[in-house]
Amino acid sequence: ETCPSYYRDASAEASIDDTADFLHAVSAMPGNNGQVMPVITPRFIPTCSDAALRGLGDLAAETGAHVQTHCSEDDWEHAHVQRRCGMSDTAALQDFGLLTDKTILAHSTFIDDDDMAMIAAAGSGVAHCPLSNVFFSNAVFPLRRALEKGLHVGLGTDISGGPAASLMDTARMTAIASRMLEEGVDASLRAGARGVPSSRVDFRTAFW
């Protein structure tokens, strides 16, 4: 229902079969020798059927392939998954078998402490995309809290989500966004109620 008819797979089975063929084709490329790894990529839960998600989770378990997908990027996605699945995006991905130690979750702006615990336990990683989040995510990812909870977090440029594909620019924006989260942005609120204390990270943390 959230994907136009001209952009849909013929069926969940066809999607899974095509993905399996893709995994094999990339792995079998002459001279690859594991240097290029294929990735299972359900774009995000709203554009995938339950059957497709579960099948891709089974395929990930069978092949040991990496997984990348969006997770709790914005208000709409976060609320959509809650309504559809009765649980958070993170919990739903875990239920579908897509939360593994080879999973990268893009954005994850709205994850809470319970989600962070699941992600850490699974050994999954988060791709923090601060510049893209400014345009699309409706909030700032709580990077410092995620690091303190033991999450693996890397930087993502999300090339379609902003004007720069530079990781150095992304590192700068990471530090800036963390300051905005800590200090707050609504000047009508008093200082103590405006932000989230102890949220900032310095550029050294952002870079590494």
What is the predicted role of each segment?
Residues 1-109:
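Metal-coordinating catalytic core of metallo-dependent amide/deamination hydrolases
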Residues 2-4, 132, 161:
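Acidic, glycine-rich active-site loops and adjacent beta-strand->loop/helix elements
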Residues 9, 13-16, 46, 50, ...:
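Electropositive phosphate-/nucleotide-binding environments in soluble metabolic enzymes
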Residues 133-134, 197:
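Short, contiguous acidic/charged loop-to-helix segments that flank catalytic cores in large enzymes
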